[in-house]
């Protein structure tokens, strides 16, 4: 489901950042250790000498084990993300999304047709976001599982809702499917993420969950 996918995506990114920070810290620590063994002079039996650091089984073992643990953690999170992305949940209702140049058409509950176009700047109200406001908003219920069928008529579009972790291509003659779910009331904004013509940047998506 969408909110699960977005949660695991954020969790994966956070894990990568933490692991990369730890790897950078260990690399800096090893470099400082090697540099100190070469530059610092030690007095042994009244003879000044430097440490000759050639190899260390401890460092090799430590680096190998930690690296394997990092890879396993990332693989586990990637497998969970792939698993939730392939799950087929029982949906409450079906919503069809069709992309045109350059607007969206939603077919909801098998009978309602919504044409969603970008509104003119002269019609903006206070607080409206530029290039993200539509004349008709798709209104859905929160805590309800919807199945989206997305397609296109003329060229390839991309139905993208970044905050829900959704990005699916709308291809003419092909119907792609994705599960849509929101855990709370919210207004979700998105745009077409595929170069579909001169007005590609003027195809906003607005979904209001109530």
Curated annotation (Swiss-Prot):
One of its GO terms (biological process) is ATP synthesis coupled electron transport. The keyword Iron does not apply. Residues 1-15, 85-210 are mitochondrial intermembrane. One of its GO terms (molecular function) is cytochrome-c oxidase activity. Signal peptide: none annotated. Binds a dinuclear copper A center per subunit. GO terms for cellular component: mitochondrial inner membrane. Keywords: Copper, Electron transport, Magnesium, Membrane, Metal-binding, Mitochondrion, Mitochondrion inner membrane, Respiratory chain, Translocase, Transmembrane, Transmembrane helix, Transport. It comes from the Eukaryota. Mg(2+) binds at residue 194. The chain crosses the membrane at residues 16-36, 64-84. SUPFAM superfamilies: Cupredoxins. Residues 37-63 are mitochondrial matrix. It is found in: Mitochondrion inner membrane. Cu cation A1 binds at residues 157, 192, 196, 203. Its main location: mitochondrion. It catalyses: 4 Fe(II)-[cytochrome c] + O2 + 8 H(+)(in) = 4 Fe(III)-[cytochrome c] + 2 H2O + 4 H(+)(out). Belongs to the cytochrome c oxidase subunit 2 family. This is Cytochrome c oxidase subunit 2.
